[in-house]
């Protein structure tokens, strides 16, 4: 497990990666993300306004986390594939004096991560948030991703082991 403190605006938030094969409580999952691979290449999508990123986003009301990733991977990268759960980042606002009970996010929430093995690269249409997609060698992801950090690196390293 790796822990990192970050500032989201003025808010100090504790993030902890947990490699886990069971999902956290559904009502506390705020987003789902995926490291998506075609052969040995990692999919990155250029998402407005974030820049280069891995596919992911907020979970919708009736979705399972895996369904969320599959939807986001298709909307952002026009890919489909099979998924394996990697674990989750615990998003802890307990040390955040700006957190408020009316927040749309729980005081203790989760960002779930999957590995997707891409079965099909569909025609890229750029109809959603993404401007483009690329497949890169995972060793160069830091040259593209807008906010790469040690948590993402630990998750990627684990995803690469699951080949």
Residue ranges and their predicted role:
Residues 153-163:
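Charge-rich, low-complexity intrinsically disordered segments
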Residues 81, 91-122:
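Active-site-adjacent beta-strand/loop module that shapes the phosphate/pyrophosphate-binding cleft
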């Amino acid at each position: 497990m790796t822990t990192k403190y970050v500032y989201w605006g003025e808010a100090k938030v504790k993030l902890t990666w947990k490699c886990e094969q069971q999902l956290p409580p559904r009502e506390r999952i705020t987003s789902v993300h995926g490291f998506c691979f075609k052969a040995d290449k990692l999919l990155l999508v250029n998402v407005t306004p974030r820049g280069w990123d891995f596919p992911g986003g907020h979970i919708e009301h009736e979705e399972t986390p895996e369904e969320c990733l599959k939807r986001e991977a298709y909307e952002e990268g026009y890919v489909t594939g099979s998924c394996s759960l990697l674990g989750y980042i615990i998003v802890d606002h307990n040390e955040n004096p700006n957190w408020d009970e009316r927040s749309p996010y729980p005081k203790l929430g989760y960002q779930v991560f999957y590995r997707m093995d891409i079965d099909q690269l569909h025609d890229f249409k750029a109809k959603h948030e993404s401007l483009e997609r690329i497949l890169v060698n995972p060793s160069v992801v830091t040259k593209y991703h807008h906010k790469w950090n040690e948590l993402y690196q630990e998750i990627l390293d684990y995803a690469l082991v699951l080949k």
